[in-house]
Amino acid sequence: MKEVTLDHPSAARQTECFTEALLFQDLGPRKVVADFSGGHLSSDGGALLLRQVDAGLGLSRALSKCFVDHRRADLIEHSVEELLRQRLQGLALGYEDLNDHRELRRDPLLAATAGKVDVLGQGRRCPEHRGFALASPATLNRMELSAEFSDYYRKIQPQEAAVGQTLLEMGVRCLPKDAEVLVLDFDATDDPLHGQQEGRFFHGYYGQYCYLPLFCFCGDVVLWAQLRTSDRDASDGTLEALQQIVAVIRARLPKVKIVVRADSGFARDTIMQWCEAQPALYYLIGLARNARLEALLEPSLATARERRCLCGGTVRVFQEFSYQTLNTWACARRTIGKAEVGPQGDNPRFIVTNIPHEGLHDTDGRLLLEGDGRWLYEELYCERGQAENQIKQMTLDLKSDRTSTHWLASNQMRLWLSAFAYLLLERLRAWGLQGTEMARASLGTLRLRLLKVAAQVSVSVRRVYVQLCSAFPLQELFAQCQRRLAEMESS
């Protein structure tokens, strides 16, 4: 193959690109030839929308304040804020691998969204770096690994407590100011390990070596992302996380009622006791089945069996009682049992709560949340599955399980970065797409349909002109989203 000559000015620093001609099937009498000499093109035109969301949230600016930069100020070419923007934009756009930035650093559109004034990189100090406006994979990697090390090559030090607090405060800022009831979903999941990472343990339930991260979501908004080793109880650290989360929520929304929702792995006396001691703080937590609980539910199970014999199908009967464990609970608590009998046989389930029977009311006596046992189980507790969908998006779309560094601290940093990128995409959907066809689209679908749009970038003294693909199917939606974000940023 013959190397294609780059004869336009924008190709001055593109001689390292792969420019060998690629031959495809003929199209009638014409040859079909392709190469990578297109110049200043980008496949991520939607990154401009992410830049607006970032500016509206002040996310990268706030996050950069959680790092201490020990580098010489006169030698810095990439500020911490620019490095974070580059990394977060890359994650949100689907470039979770740092090696992707080996070529992405020459993308002028990504450079513009990262805050680079010199989007072409022509003013770089070192001649061999000119044409690369953004940081290299090695520079980004040092920023992530500096969570573990402090030496000559790792001079950007994160303040880990501040990073976690910033994620929490950013998430709480995204909650509606007029909310009367907030539901906090806690859940743990597995993060498989394929090497000899620090904190590597085998987990019997998941049947593999893994980490056991703890997440907390309020609706679609992530509030907490904590990387933990798997040699612990699933609820370990939940009380400490809950105390921080409630404090930040109360500071912004002092009158809101909070419901903690979780599966049976979080039915721990310390968590429930603390909730019971706080004003307007409630819990709705699953209970694992045992012989005592099933014996208490047996009358309802018998009734359900009889009804199924008469009408077939699946029958549910709900029963409430007061229950206390033999050794681990300090007091008896309101317990709701679901006696379900279907084609597969008996399926008893249990939840424990301190939500009163009369429900939750505001100061005027208006009902905010029902207290009926059936409603609490079917309408409120079963919605807990949405948290699993959020974790799935965090894992599959933002690659939060890319915890492949050797050290636990740097893997925690990667988890946080994925959580911040998740927040960018979630806010793009909430602020820019509410009431549209993509208002409930998954983050992966949102990225594919709205952000992956071809763009040609022209740079002059006065402006950066981005020409988006004329055949883009969602042009009206893109423009509508941009207008909404611009209005929100200016308000």
Where are these regions (language model features)?
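Acidic/histidine-rich, metal-coordinating catalytic segments
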Residues: D187, V256-A267
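Short, glycine-/Ser/Thr-/acidic-enriched flexible segments
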Residues: T189-D191, V221, R228-S230, A288-N290, ...
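Dynamic "connector" segments at or just before major functional cores
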Residues: M1-Q208, L212-R232, L239-R252, A277, ...
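Short, surface-exposed basic-aromatic patches at helix termini and helix-loop junctions that form
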Residues: M272-L281
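A short acidic (Asp/Glu
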Residues: G195, R268-Q273, E294-E298
